[in-house]
Amino acid sequence: DMMRLVHAIGIETVLSDLAVYIEQDFLRWELFDKTPRIASHSPNGVIELMPTSDGEVYGFKYVNGHPKNTSEGLQTVTAFGLLADVSNGYPVLLSEMTILTALRTAAMSALAAKYLAPAGAKTMALIGNGAQCEFQALAFRTICGIQNLRFYDIDRGATEKAMRNLGQTGLHLTACDSPED
């Protein structure tokens, strides 16, 4: 499963490798069908289907976002995906992708920052300290060399949890009282 793979390889290696694959795919941008995601919105959240193909492989990801799920003991986000061979239409992979979604999001963010952030930046702010922020922190350290993190969330408990979970990573962590800090 994905978590065993991440633990065996190491999260920094997974994030770094993902960023390389993402960058390689950007270099093949013109080959991809760029179909907008299909979204179904409800008062409780959103379900999205994200299809694409490079002409050889067709793939899609199904992902939801239901913020109040945690009050019922459910995950806020769940995802799965499928890859199929375009030449014969046969599925070649069906995979749970919840953790991969978090990793890919973080790797993509850090890859963008690699090109867009000021050269030599070592400090960043994480505004909103839910589960994704921990993946972001590790990706930005691995891909961009970030060493100092400033945390802010309207839920102080989220900041405390993120800082606790990242406390042994060697990053310099600072809790902030406002987004301006």
Regions found by a protein language model. Name each.
Residues 116-123, 145:
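Short helix-loop-beta connector
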Residues 1-102, 110, 117-120:
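N-terminal ligand-binding/catalytic initiation module
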Residues 133-134:
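N-terminal Rossmann-fold NAD(P) dinucleotide-binding loop
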Residues 143-169:
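NAD(P)-binding Rossmann-fold cofactor-contacting core
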Residues 169-181:
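Short acidic low-complexity segments
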Residues 125, 149-150, 174:
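A structural signal for isolated positions on well-ordered beta-strands in alpha/beta enzyme cores
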Residues 129-130:
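Glycine-rich Rossmann-fold phosphate-binding loop(s) that bind the pyrophosphate
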Residues 137, 141-142:
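Gly/Ala-rich phosphate-binding loop of Rossmann-like dinucleotide-binding domains
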